[in-house]
Amino acid sequence: MSGVSYLQSLETIDPDTVTQKLRQMRLEKLQAERAAREQALLDDIDTVWQEFSDAVILGDSRAVGFSYYSFLDASRVLASSGERIDAIDGHIEDLKKLDPAYIFLCYGINDLGWYGSAQDYADTLLEKIRLLRRELPEAVIVVSSILPAYEPAVSREKLWLQIPDYTAAVQAMCEENGVLFADNTQLSEDYADLWQPDGIHLLPEFYPHWAANLIFASWGEIADA
């Protein structure tokens, strides 16, 4: 059936039903376009770094890898070993100078144990996000879920087992406050072999996949048309 014929056939249907069908058609079209856009990036994943030309990554030692392995310039990666979200305040002036369009927050592994609960951590992270929004109101903020730890790390430190709880609390906080969230759960399972032997840090081959997931999150959710 042609597009014109299809629309003519809708004339005999209840207007609310027509509206719903048209919205569904538009949503499916947008979803297909998004899927094609994502696949195009995955098919040529080394081009993902072009997407970070106006972005800054904040985070801990795992985020350091973005610059350590020369994927991104060090000026665009404000991260250091052992860093926690309480360090965000100290990056404000550098962020203002860089004036990025996107800020990716890649923290968490060092924050475990510093807060009374996963909810306390999520609440504190929200305070930092509000600070960033006040100081850099034009920037889009994306929160990366905490990447997991694997053996032998989890045998040495049981705190790592709390990562799923922290992820759930942060994701809920982001959804409630309109903050973009990059869920790395499935990605980390798919590429679990790309962790360093210590079970915490990452091999360089993981970074393009993580970067792509961050970029996908930065595009936002597809609104119900």
Predicted regions and their residues:
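Conserved SGNH/GDSL esterase-like catalytic core that processes O-acyl groups on lipids
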Residues: L42-T124
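A short helix->loop->beta-strand "cap" motif at the edges of active sites that frequently abuts
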Residues: L136-V140
